[in-house]
Amino acid sequence: MISVSNVTMRYGSKILFEDVSTQFISGRRYGLTGPNGAGKSTFMKVLTGELEAQKGVVVRPRKLGILRQDQYAFDAYRVIDTVIMGNAPLWAALEERENLYNKAELTDEDGSRLGELEGIVGDENGYEAEADAAILLQGLDIPDSVHERKMSELQGGQKVRVLLAQALFGSPDALLLDEPTNYLDLESVHWLQDFLLAYRGTLITISHDRHFLNAVCTHIADIDYQTIITYNGGYDDMVMQKVSVRTRIESQNEEREKKIEQLNDFIARFSAGTRSSQVNSRKKEVERLATTELARSNIQRPFIRFDMLRPSGKHVLEIEGVTKTYDTPAPDGTTGPVFTPFTCSLLRGDKVILMGRNGTGKTTLIKSLLSGVPDVQDNDFVRTHGDVKWGHEAQIGYFAQDHKAAIQHGTTVAEWLHGFDPKKSTEEIRGILGQMLFRGEEGTKKTDALSGGEAARLLFCKLMMQKPNILILDEPTNHLDLESINALNQSLQKYEGTVLLVTHDQDLIEEVGTRIWHFEHGKVTDHKGPYEEYQQQLAMSAK
């Protein structure tokens, strides 16, 4: 169990949460939610001890499993060792034992200490540590061939999965996971869900994956109104319960403001008259109400709407024998084509979900389709095999997986966006930015200083302004909060153009897609139907 008593955190004059007291009970699985900027990551750091609360006390269990966000902290270590380091007492004992065995001669004191260390290793299941770590890595799709490599040799997505295995290792009393599904493919997300459902300690997770929160969490701890309110059930249950809480709090705010307005009106009308005692009484009442201002919600909802300047022709895309061969081995050591030659055609209005494990070629196929297309092609990428023909009036809007690299540095948010349509007025640019929560002076923010979520929202501004009839989105939900993901989901469902979408977000897969391209075992399978139908087909084939 983790106990929080009277905890307060502020940044300058901004209150994130104040005098929060709550308990996270063993056997329960908590989702920590709230809009961006509400203080989720700050509160998580207070729970782990990385940050000290400005006021209040946090009581933690001895063994915490923590998903660390620093991908480079373990570059000097083997992958398998990085996982084992998740059990700090075991790793300390293993290191000390190795140092003693490396001594030229052992003293009696050293021998006694070795006996103590062997006891610790045994108590912590250290003799099975490498086997247990390997099972975790395999579940997270880190192949055996990588386990002995240094962390510095891995790509970013692989590093995150190793760090997730580190957090899960050693049967911790509590798990604190900040965005555990980032960079996980759908199969790995399902494996993680099953693991967490069987976990018997205390789980606290920050996630912007609604489906994951609904599947895993027994409770939601929501940061809003400068406090933390815990709701029973998953994310959707919390949303329904929060409506009544929000209605009550906002009604109290409205009543308070109306009362202040009435009192000020009385003061203005009678301050020069004979009713001075009544005026003074009302002034005191205004002061009292002003000092007891009720907190307001931090929730901000972006507005995303993808329109088309003009529709494309009926036949949007013809793909003939497309594949890609790299000159150097892939990160897992394999060579040859990423997938067998793929042939397919798309019609106007198709909404295709590209899904499959990481590294199976989804982004490679996207880049192959865009090779040779001005403004959206990757200049460092060359399609090695096959032909691609885009149809009449095809206008492509592209959201790359490395979306921050698509935004020019050394300028402001408004200037960068204005560059794509100089004919638009400053007011029109501000209006588009405002839809994606860049309000007031935020339009003058330097592009170099944008967070991942802000960069994503800025790219959506560009796509809305360009009004393409084909949207190609490669992992657009990374770094978005739940409100932004829900807005994107709704906009893609309403969009009348053609969509190619790489995502591991199950809600997007189920609710947006009308067609599936599944990448598996070096092959791309084209299923002309939604995800639910595809799952039914797979189930029938398995019988």
Question: Residue spans of the language-model regions?
Answer:
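Short histidine/acidic/glycine/proline-rich micro-motifs that form metal-
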Residues: 123, 272-273
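Proline-centered turn/helix-capping motifs that create local helix->coil transitions or kinks
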Residues: 128, 274-278, 287-299, 331, ...
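Intracellular alpha-helical coupling/juxtamembrane segments of multi-pass membrane proteins
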Residues: 241-266, 270, 279-295
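Short secondary-structure transition/capping segments
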Residues: 252, 256, 300-307
